[in-house]
Amino acid sequence: MPLYEHVFLARQDVTAQQVETMVETYKGVIETGGGTIEKIESWGVKSLAYRIKKNRKAHFTLLNISAPPAALAEMERQMQISEDVLRFMTVRVEQLEAEPSAMMQKRDRDDRKDRDRGDRPRRRDDDFGGGDRGDRGDRGDRPERNFGGEN
């Protein structure tokens, strides 16, 4: 059976519970057509690069699907009809990823931002303060530069 990665964007004013209900509806469509949804990832509400149907943010959801093309086509047809779905994209893949997607790994990495350098010593350039690093000698007296056209 063909394998697909499917991402859809739901309007920002839809609640997370309503997005879960939509996912369950689409899961039912796929299962009725003889397929299965292997993995569901909710990436949360994210800003869009540009406005889509007057929305600046959207709920992002990833579905890893194993289904015949007819079942997938029916799910996509229902998404086109739904006013809550802004956009969707389906990509056929050779195999489905078992580990979390790059978006989920990025979220995990962002959760660790509050960590500091640990037991490593503070580097001089950590604060990007610039200033004298001590690696160059004195430039000495320099003649005054003349800007503005006066000779």
UniProtKB/Swiss-Prot annotation:
Which UniProt keywords are present, listed alphabetically?
Ribonucleoprotein, Ribosomal protein, RNA-binding, rRNA-binding
Keyword Amino-acid biosynthesis listed: no
Indicate whether Lyase appears among the record's keywords: no
Q: Where is the composition biased (Basic and acidic residues)?
A: 105-151
- Annotated segments matching region Disordered: 97-151
Q: Where is the signal peptide?
A: none
- SUPFAM superfamilies assigned: Ribosomal protein S6
GO terms for cellular component? cytosolic small ribosomal subunit
Q: Name one GO molecular function term.
A: small ribosomal subunit rRNA binding
Q: Which domain of life is it from?
A: Bacteria
The processes (GO biological process) annotated in the record are: translation
Gene3D superfamilies tied to this protein: 3.30.70.60
Q: Which CDD domains match?
A: bS6 (cd00473)
Protein purpose: Binds together with bS18 to 16S ribosomal RNA.
List, alphabetically, the NCBIfam families matched. S6
For this chain, the family text in UniProt reads:
Belongs to the bacterial ribosomal protein bS6 family.
Listed name of the protein: Small ribosomal subunit protein bS6
Origin organism of this chain? Methylorubrum populi (strain ATCC BAA-705 / NCIMB 13946 / BJ001) (Methylobacterium populi)
| Designated gene of the protein | rpsF
